[in-house]
Swiss-Prot record:
Part of the 30S ribosomal subunit. This is Small ribosomal subunit protein uS11c. It is found in: Plastid, Chloroplast. GO terms for cellular component: chloroplast; ribonucleoprotein complex; ribosome. One of its GO terms (biological process) is translation. HAMAP family: Ribosomal_uS11 (MF_01310). PROSITE patterns: RIBOSOMAL_S11. Pfam families: Ribosomal_S11. Belongs to the universal ribosomal protein uS11 family. InterPro entries: Ribosomal_uS11, Ribosomal_uS11_CS, Ribosomal_uS11_sf.
Length: 132
């Protein structure tokens, strides 16, 4: 008689206290995405200006970036999951400063803030300029 394959159903997400994490702020010209990971790089929570209800050109505003950053950080602080964080800011968008300000005002102790915007050392040729 053939043996039946049994599957194990494990919970997908386990709630674990990270206490120390890394907050990545990706500020593009159109949107701002904030991701919180643990020290190993496993994503714990995320938010963006579009996910907070801002649509169209309102997504690129500094207020939308502030709302997205405050949203993701407040959920983790209220659950007691995050006490100390490192902040990595990437991109040239208008919401990078206000997102950092919202993270600093949330009560999380920031160990350091680093700008990791990729800058070419004269690598690839950029695309031609738009003419509108």
């Amino acid at each position: 008689m053939p043996r039946r394959a049994t599957r194990r159903f494990l919970p997908r997400k386990t709630k674990h206290r990270i206490l120390k994490g890394v907050i990545y702020v990706r500020a593009s010209f159109r949107n701002t995405i904030v991701t919180v990971t643990d020290t190993r790089g496993q994503a714990v929570s995320w938010s963006s200006a579009g996910a907070c209800g801002f649509k169209g050109t309102k997504r690129r505003s500094p207020f939308a970036a502030q709302t997205a950053a405050a949203n993701v950080v407040d959920t983790l602080v209220n659950q007691g999951l995050l006490k100390e964080a490192e902040v990595m800011i990437s991109g040239p968008g208008p919401g990078r400063d206000t997102a950092l300000r919202a993270i600093a005002q949330s009560g999380i102790q920031l160990s350091y803030v680093r700008d990791v915007t990729p800058m070419p050392h004269n690598g690839c040729r950029p695309p031609k300029r738009r003419r509108v």
